[in-house]
Amino acid sequence: MNREQYLKNLSVPEGKIDVVLDTDAYNEIDDQFAIGYMLRNTQKFNIKGICAAPFLNGKSTCASDGMEKSYNEIRKLLSLAEMNDLESRVFKGSEEFLKDEKTAVRSEAADFMAALADDYSPEKPLYIVAIGAITNVASALLKNPQMTENCVVVWLGGHGVHMPLAASEFNMKQDIAAARVVFGCGIPLVQLPCGGVVDHFLTSKYELEHWLTGKNPLCDYLYNNTVQEADSYAAGKPWTRVIWDVTAVAWLLNENSKFMAERLIPSPIPEYDGHYAFDSSRHLIKYVYNINRDSLFEDLFNKLGEKG
């Protein structure tokens, strides 16, 4: 695509858009909020698919186990939101992370995204929101390089460029090879950095209780799941939680910069030692550098509290 179209595709889209969500839904308590937020914004999103991403931490025995648990969590959330009609659009993702930067990991999710992308164009792109390790998306790109023309990727991953060890953030460090594919291929990319930016998107038990409890089954689940997780390490103590992943969905709703501020920067280069390298001649990406916490939580809580 030409430069004018490329920069347009790095701008918040107008009107209703087709979107795929790629999520490690069981990894944390925030993916569930992001999924719910997307499901409740039907006036903006035509959800083409929800893909389960791999993860490995204390909640999974291996990347494959994390992906399977995320797949089941996605289906649970669709049931709670009374949107079971979307179950046929849920896809299992990669069972392992990339072994190198040239070889795709085969999965339903990667095959689905690679094939779907051919239905789009630079003038009418497919939006892919990724909120976990970016293995599925990188694999799809390796399978179908034309995605760089036909898609836009919005990813919550990495830390702020001003921070040390910025490439050591959880989503990014699990699959640096995948991150290097996505940051290096030239696809229009919007980065929501975690440390130093999105970590300001905090909420507390009492705020969640006020805005969510008793509204609907999805809201009750989000509240109980978050409190249970926090009480597992901070019972009887004050705590807050960052609802990280909501911000990636919210970028697509960020008309007039109401939820966040952004700028163009040359695409950073994630390195295997946990740092970024920088080259001012690289292609531009959109980089979010500030979150309007109160404005976004107001919209999130109001949307989640709707009956469906």
Predicted features along the sequence, with ranges:
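N-terminal acidic, glycine/proline-rich low-complexity segments
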Residues: 1-308
